[in-house]
Swiss-Prot record:
Primary gene name: yihV
Family membership noted in the UniProt record: Belongs to the carbohydrate kinase PfkB family.
Organism of this sequence: Escherichia coli (strain K12)
The protein, known as: Sulfofructose kinase
EC number: 2.7.1.184
Subunit structure: Homodimer.
Length: 298
């Protein structure tokens, strides 16, 4: 069984389903509403667990009801939260998300300032117990410390390179695999054209670099050339968490086979199936469902 650690944030997603995304100020009425745990690393952890991995989530929550719910939900998906730190008299993080009838969304995130960025306490954790460590960029200090400890232990590192105000160059340098969103890659490199931006990112690391582009698929560099995996066409209901799910699946696939093209194809299939159901986690498939889906595109 593949052993995975996912380091980063967990937030409560409060999701409002609307006819169209707001384009101006005013009042809007949602046609449906749900609350579900979210956050890049946390949702990646759920995806990895759904795919049969043994998973630990390493992060921070407050001691409020939201924190209780976030940890309980992760545990219900088979994710171990023994290494998650709880802060006294602290609020947990949350997001408000609006999703339109095409599955596109707007996210407003509240990263709780009560959750201190210090990550020195990760020194107490034995990172050699995992096959791969995935980290998001929303807890920069945590990702840096986790990747440093993982590399010292000879453990593969996978970075979810989404957009963030901070410079993530040092995290990219510590990554064996850095998979960026388009906004994240553009923010890092200052280059809007994705092919050029990907080459620029490659200069920061000896590892592999990827960029996910939604319906345009995923590109990565391998053996000096640019490779491409088209997105699978599905009836999209909700794209919330699709990128997070992709990263969790990519980590599992890379730790299992190591073949980049095969791993990207597998992760793309998992993310596509997730988009066919509402919420960031309810639609995450298991390995059998994913293989059955991929067999349709041979």
């Amino acid at each position: 069984m593949i052993r995975v650690a996912c380091v980063g944030i967990t937030v409560m997603d409060r999701i409002y389903y609307v006819e169209g995304l707001p384009t101006e100020s005013g009042k809007y009425v949602a046609r449906n509403y749900t609350e579900v745990g979210g956050g890049p690393a946390a949702t990646a952890a759920v995806a990895a667990a759904r795919l049969g991995a043994q998973v630990d989530f390493i992060g921070r929550v407050g001691d409020d009801d939201t924190g209780n719910s976030l940890l309980a939900e992760l545990e219900s998906w088979g994710v171990n939260t023994r290494y998650t730190k709880r802060y006294n008299q602290a609020k947990s993080s949350q997001s408000a998300i609006m999703v339109d009838t095409k599955g596109e969304r707007i996210i407003i995130n509240y990263p709780s300032p009560d959750l201190l960025p210090d990550a020195e306490w990760l020194e107490e954790i034995d990172f050699s117990q995992w096959d791969v460590v995935l980290a998001d960029v929303r807890w920069h200090d945590g990702a840096k410390k986790a990747f440093t400890l993982a590399r010292q232990a000879g453990v593969m590192t996978v970075l979810d390179g989404d957009i963030t105000p901070q410079d993530i160059s040092e995290l990219v340098a510590l990554s064996d695999h850095a998979a960026f969103s388009e906004p994240g890659l553009a923010r890092l490199t200052g280059v809007k054209e994705m092919a050029s931006a990907l080459k620029q990112a490659q200069t920061l690391t000896n590892g592999h670099v990827y960029v996910t582009q939604g319906s345009a698929g995923c590109d990565w560099l391998e053996n000096g050339g640019r490779q491409h995996q088209p997105a699978f066409k599905v009836d999209v209901v909700d794209t919330t968490g699709a990128g997070d799910v992709f990263h969790g699946a990519l980590a599992v696939a890379l730790a299992t086979s190591g073949d980049l093209a095969e791993s990207v194809r597998f992760a793309s299939g998992v993310a596509a199936l997730k988009c066919t159901r509402p919420g960031g986690r309810a639609g995450i498939p298991d390995c059998d469902q994913t293989r059955s889906f991929l067999s349709l595109f041979v």
